[in-house]
Structure formats: C-alpha cells, structure tokens
Amino acid sequence: AMENAGAVINKALVAQYTKYCAEAQKEVEKEPPHMRRGTIPEMVLTDAMIANARNESNVAIISIVRLAGEGRDRKLEPGDYYLSPEEHALMAGVKQHFEKVVVLLNVCGQMDMEWVDVYQPSAVLMVWIPGQEGASAAADILMGHVNPSGRLTDTIAKSWRDIPSSENFGAWADGFELYTGDEDQIPYWGGVGNHEMIPVGETVVRPLGNRRYTEYQEG
C-alpha cells in the first residue's frame, strides 16, 4: 500500500518480516482451533536491525494491533489495553535511531495513550479496524494525498482511569475504585456521554470531532 502511494520502502526488511510471518503462522496452526490467537507473536527487532533500517529509511512506521470479540474480551493488561513490554522496547529502540516515527493504531477499541507523552512520536494515526482497503487509505493519509480530518466519533482519553464511567465497571484489585452497583443493577449516575470528558482537560488526547488536526503552510 505504501509503495502504491508513492513511498520508497525497505524491501529487505519487508522480505524478512514476510518470511517470519509465514513461519509463525505455521506454529499457530499447530494449536487447537478454539485456542488459536487472533494474531501471531510479533517479530523481535534487535538494535542492530533497527540501526540498519535507519540507513535505508528516514521514517519509521510502527503498527500496533489489538483484536477482540466474542469470547475474547478486552483486558486491562499489557498487550491489550496497555502496551506490552515488547512494544515498549520497540518504541524506545525505534525512537533512539529514527527522528521521524509514525504509529498506526490498528485496534478494535481504545487503548492506553500515556505512552504518547513518553515516546513522543511524530504522528499517531488511529485507523481502528479499517477493512480490506484500510492499508491503502492509511497510506494515502501518510503520503499527504488526503487530509486526515480528525473528526473523531469518540473521545480518546490518555488513561482508562480518566474516563468517568470507569468507576462503574468491574471490581478493582488495585484499590482504584470498587464496583458501585449490586448484582442486579449497574448505576449510570455519571460519566456517560462525551460531555463528561469536557472538564478533564489534559486527560484527553484529542477532543470529540468537528475539527482538523492538520497544520498547513503556504508557499
């Protein structure tokens, strides 16, 4: 998709990753069908591999993937709502060698965004689960062929705890907030709707829609 959009890609790294994916998929298929993961384990990039990639490219694109669905609920755990240790290591390693880093969030729902302040990528593109032509659409955005309007249909908080309605979900072992309902009722006394996010200020990564986040320069 990036090549079709006009980008020059690191073909050696693509070939290496394609080979890895084929081998990893064979291992996944050895598992019973009902126990198979939705994705394969990501290939580990060594510091030397990242440094070599920098010699071939001036922009790095990191894709973060999350899947969920029936029988596979989201969890407040590393590798789901939070970045995994491997993803943290990848972010840190890539930022060490690349000045320009773009993160694609190919995810089924919101996730923790506090890492944006830590690693400060050049851009973060939320593509959700975009479907068959999603890669082409993302490539057109990254190459500047279309305007990433940022007209969000949701409010993305930096942290789960910044969402007011989080007080009404689950029973927290970490002492944050115990479930406030009983066995028969869930109280929606507050925190429902995007208007509840307005007072939280810096806890919001981007506010709800109706504006563009693209900056323009004439000349």
Give the role of each language-model region.
Residues 1-38, 106, 110-219:
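Secreted, periplasmic, or luminal enzymes acting at the cell surface/secretory milieu
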Residues 13, 17-119:
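Hydrophobic helix-and-loop "lid/oligomerization" segment in the mid-to-C-terminal part
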